[in-house]
Amino acid sequence: MNAEQILQTDTLKTLYFTSQDTVLMTDGTLQTCDFDSPAIESIKQLVKANPEQFGFDFEPDLLVRFTSRSHITQWLNDISKEVPAAPSASLLQQSETATRAKRVLEQAVLKGSSDIHIELFKHQTRLEVRVDGRMIELMKPIGEYEYGELLIGYLFNELCEDKDDDFHVGTINNGRMSLLLDTPKGKRETQWRLAYIPAKDKGGQCTLRWSNKETSIPTLDNIGWEAGHVNVMRDFMNSASGICLIAGQTSSGKTTTIAAALSEMKRQGRSINTVEDPVEFDLGVIQTSVTAKQGQDNHFNAYTKALLRHDVDIESHGEVRDELGAMDVCRKGETGQIMFSTLHTSSAVGIAHTLNEQMHVPSALLAAPDLMKLWIYQTLVRTVCPHCALSLEQAKETWSEQQKTHFAVWQASMASFNPKSLRFRNPEGCSQCVEGEKGRTTLIEMVVLDDDDRALILSRDYLAWLKALKVKGFKSVVDHANLKILRGEVDIFSAAGRVDGLFPKDTNAVYQGLWEEV
């Protein structure tokens, strides 16, 4: 047998490349290297529903025959090398691509993914998803360029309601789409933000962010903060005016935090408006979704300026990205409103440097009395699965020598702790988790700005400012990580992957060891 005897449609090829263990031959037999493969039943159902499409009548049951995995692999490689169809897909091909797209999205959704990455290479398509912050394969790599090209093209050209342009493999593109899908919480309308960037060899990457994944808004008491953090935020929420900025990486929970705060503040006698790109939570207040168009750098500013005429008490801007956006936030804070916004930087103290040095907000404005009130940095770290977590003694058996050294350094930096309270991820995992972890919790640090802070911000002496904060008892994100490690909530090495400085470093020892022979 050879690849020419394999029946091929887009739907069948999706099943072949997804399972990589079963194919349907022109004589109506199924060749498989795994009799338990789910692909066998999927192909049977497909043929039963469409017997005329495959050139033979459906028998009571298709004959399943065993073949080696090497044969299957070779046949799939041969299929992927065949000349692709013309770019203008037939109606049948488009229909099959639509089925493929929905299947990919539903697989990702049912895994609890926040993002889908479709990576297009010269002779291969890769599909990966982000679950609890970790990138994992959605399916095995598909040895075909056309698979990914058609999939991305269909998403942009047929499903996107708002996009920069029609899809072209060599052009940056952005868009949004909505699709009814089966989710872990039942069938519902899912909303996606798409971004595409080209790469070498006519490749590229399409990233899909599930923007309305969460169906409910958590309370401030349930986002992983300590009670003291919540009290500080509520003090700010009850103030007359001022700015709260929340920093962090992409997917660090910043928008969720603001949603929790605004949800608590609504219907309390104050007018609330948000300007977002895009709207992610339904807050029950006036929310404006801003659409970026090519060549329009000030689109966000036009909306925020319009809100000056709308008698707003509390306002939230999705993200500060540039000088214009930063000055908008400062302007609103000066007009007597409570302002929330987010930005990308790596610490709460770093907000000052980012706004001043990168976005050119004058230090005098940042240090203005009662303007900047609360700066927060947060990140998300995976939590240890309670069903298969390891004790310290069990975990040590799985660690590398480097991990043992790091743990010893961390242990020496702790004043005292109960080793029995520590818990570590089980690399083998269980049916309830992925590699020993399930879900995520928040690690944060807060700066509650006072006049001493403002004086040091004005002088731009950020190292002195950090020292002064520590004297006052400032709790850093490292401190919060250590607290949750000691409680057994998070694995120390998972936390170290999200928080710098968890393992203290002696730079003298580092430099002296650079040329030591291993």
Regions found by a protein language model. Name each.
Residues G242-C244, A259-V384:
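Switch/coupling sub-region of P-loop NTPases
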Residues T255:
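Walker A/P-loop
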Residues S37, K122-Q124, M135, T183-P184, ...:
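Conserved nucleotide-binding/hydrolysis micro-motifs of P-loop NTPases
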Residues I116, W192, F236, D277, ...:
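Residue-level signature of catalytic and energy-coupling elements of molecular machines
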Residues S252, S347-V448:
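Cys/His-rich Zn2+-binding cysteine-cluster or related metal-binding knuckle/ribbon modules and their
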Residues M1-T14:
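Short Lys/Arg-enriched alpha/beta "domain-start" segment
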Residues D10, F17-D57, D78-L245, Q249-S252, ...:
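N-terminal "pre-motor" subdomain/linker immediately upstream of P-loop NTPase catalytic cores
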Residues D221, V230-V232, Q402-V518:
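NTP-binding/hydrolysis catalytic cores, primarily Walker-type P-loop NTPases
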